[in-house]
Amino acid sequence: MVLVSCSSHKKSSTEMEIVKNELEKIRIIDQYCATNGRPPDKFKDYPIEKWNNFKDSVYQKNQQKIEAYLDKYGYLGFNEIGEHSSNILRLVAQHSDKNINFQKRILTELKVQVDKKNAKASNYAYLYDRVKINSNQMQYYATQVEYNKLGQAIPKKLEDSINIDARRIEYSLMPLKKYLNLLTKNHFEMNKDYFLKRGITEPKLYK
C-alpha cells in the first residue's frame, strides 16, 4: 500500500482551474464585504450590527474553504494557480481576524513560498503585521492603519519607525507616505458624503 500525504496530492491542470474559479468567487464576495463598512443598497434594511454579523459569516465560510484547500494541496503559489489566484489566499486570511490561528497558519506557509519566490513578499508583510496587531504587538511594515478625525491614515503601533521605508522596500511595498496618502484618498472617496457634511471637501494628504 502506498500512502500519499495531503501536501503531495497531484495538482492536475483541470483541478487547478476549478480551484482558481472558486477562489475568484471567494475574492468577489470578500471584497464586497470588505469595501462596505456600512450596509450597501442590497442590504439597506440591515442595522449595522446585522451587517457586521453577515460579513463575519462570509469571512468564516471563506476561511473554511481555504483551509480545505490547504489540507488537500498545501499552500498554492504562483506555480500552481498564478499570481492573481494565489493572492486570494492571503486576502482571506487578512479578513479572518476572529481566527488568529488560521492567520498564523497561512503566514507560516506563505513565508515558505515567499522564500521560494512562489508568492509575493508584500503579502507576507501585510499578513505579518495583521497577526502582530491582532496579538496586541507592534507591527513591522506599517501596513495596518487607523484614521484620525480628518480622515488621514495613521499606522497603528509600529516598531522601529525610523527604518520603516527600508523594510517596506525590501518587501516590495511603496514608501510609507505614498501608501498613507493612497489610503487616505480611498477612505475619503468611500466616505465622501460623511466628510462633505463635516466641511472636509478633499482628502487631507501628507506633504
Where are these regions (language model features)?
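Alpha-helical solenoid repeat scaffolds
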Residues: 123-132, 159, 195, 200, ...
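Polybasic, proline/glycine-rich intrinsically disordered low-complexity segments
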Residues: 140, 146-150
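Short secondary-structure boundary/hinge segments and terminal tails
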Residues: 6-8, 88, 186
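Short acidic, Pro/Gly- and aromatic-enriched capping/linker segments at domain boundaries
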Residues: 151-167
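A cross-kingdom marker for long, charged
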Residues: 163-207
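N-terminal helix-rich structural modules
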Residues: 10-135, 142
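General secondary-structure edge motif
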Residues: 46, 90, 147-148, 159
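Bacterial Sec-dependent N-terminal signal peptides
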Residues: 1-16, 207
